[in-house]
Amino acid sequence: MDCQKVGDLIYRLRKEKQLTQKELANQIGISDKTISKWERGLGCPDVSLLKDLSEIFQINIEKILDGKLTSNIRKGGNMKRIEFYVCPLCGNVLTSSNYVDISCCGRQLDPLTIVDHQIPFQMKNIDGESLLTFDCQMSKEDYISFVAYVEYDRYYFIKLYPVQAPEVRLPELRRGKLYCYSIKEGFMLLK
């Protein structure tokens, strides 16, 4: 941990939040002289204070320890670049249309990668909608967690649960991409 980098980061974040050293110190329960010492690179925050700093500045503790924030390159959030993330502990599903650092349950998440396997499915067009029926058991050990249909400007996300019928209704499928995530078999691009 480089105290100079950490101090510079705390200074920039404090200024962003429009806080004085005294106001920040009062929120954490320390003296303003301590904040001044950190910002000059003459010391680093105690481990017990990192959680408070993280909450006040709304950044990860790791970023405070690293002493720098990296901003993403703005790519316009094109839906062609959509990434899906699934937490292995709680099953939370997250998406992003640009590169992003995502964590859940205290762990950094990587975007799902498409596997070569396909789940067999049938598609019927009914009343301007597409009914997709999957050949899947939908047991607690092996079920489809979600189906997503991505078009150029939007996406449709349907969450499925164990013991539920393995079928979903979507707007009539045209030129988008159809994704499916099975707990056992992984993330698939359906064709």
Tell me the role of every PLM-derived stretch.
Residues 87-90, 102-104:
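Short cysteine-rich clusters marking metal-coordination/redox-active sites
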